[in-house]
Amino acid sequence: MNRPERLQPGVKLRDAEKVSRIPVKVVPSERETMLRKPDWLRVKLPASNQRITDIKQALRKNGLHSVCEEASCPNLSECFNHGTATFMILGAICTRRCPFCDVAHGRPLKPDAEEPKKLAQTIKDMKLKYVVITSVDRDDLRDGGAQHFADCIREIRLLNPEIKIETLVPDFRGRIDAALDILATEPPDVFNHNLETAPMHYRKARPGANYQWSLDLLKKFKERHPDIPTKSGLMMGLGESNEEIAQVLYDLRAHNVEMLTLGQYLQPSKFHLAVERYVSPAEFDELKELAESIGFTHAACGPLVRSSYHADLQAQGKEVR
């Protein structure tokens, strides 16, 4: 068996190069075997692209990244056109290689020490009132990137004192307590960490992650910050059953998670995990009813829902589908 070539710093691996490095073999999808996308997943493009262009230019000018672009989110046009974006810090190269995700894998460069200030200024220039800050996984860093998150939050609030900040964090594998100690110095307004799928599907979908670790991260943050909402997101269409997803909802509530996002998995390329089913809007409605009945304060459930989709409205408890 040939060993994978040594990763070079700053080089992005995508598609076949990326998924070839995971323990589960992903067979490229053939066009004739791919499920036809249903009508309810058609995205209406905005009449004007000027706002989209402006946001992209602001990101490029300051060397910043948005997960909207890096992960090929289907809602990019809508969110950018409404003047919202989810900023991705710590670079655009992830140390993990999840085969559902379109973010590049590789050996990241050293974190940009000026990124917190550049991010804060960009947010001020964009006149945003609510921002989501996420990151790639940085298993190469001793604290998993926690201090960089705290630095970004501090700088953002210095220039934008009225802003609300949601963090969508990685799992801080093997360093949860140390990371939470650091984050406690600059806690967000909403703490989000995605479970992504049911535990039976972790080996194929989230190599390197652990279902219980992710639950523990959410619970431990809530124990330290009982007044800050905790949130998690899941995808459907990776081979799970509705019953498996229902059990995940019960597990989240048992770990004091209050907010939920539930959406349809969409295959970024033929080299990624195939979509095994398209979940109907009616099924999402049923799971939303279950979530609300077991105590979630807000559940955004629908085919195009993503963890940061209209996050400001989610935080206000408004309907998002």
UniProtKB/Swiss-Prot annotation:
Entries under PROSITE patterns matching the protein: RADICAL_SAM
EC number: 2.8.1.8
A Pfam family per the record: LIAS_N
InterPro entries reported for this sequence: Aldolase_TIM, Elp3/MiaA/NifB-like_rSAM, LIAS_N, Lipoyl_synth, rSAM
Residues binding [4Fe-4S] cluster 2: 94, 98, 101
Radical SAM core domain boundaries: 80-297
Top-level EC class: transferase
CDD domains in UniProt: Radical_SAM
Subcellular location: Cytoplasm
Cofactor field: [4Fe-4S] cluster
HAMAP family with a match to the protein in the record: Lipoyl_synth (MF_00206)
Protein name, per record: Lipoyl synthase
Organism: Shewanella halifaxensis (strain HAW-EB4)
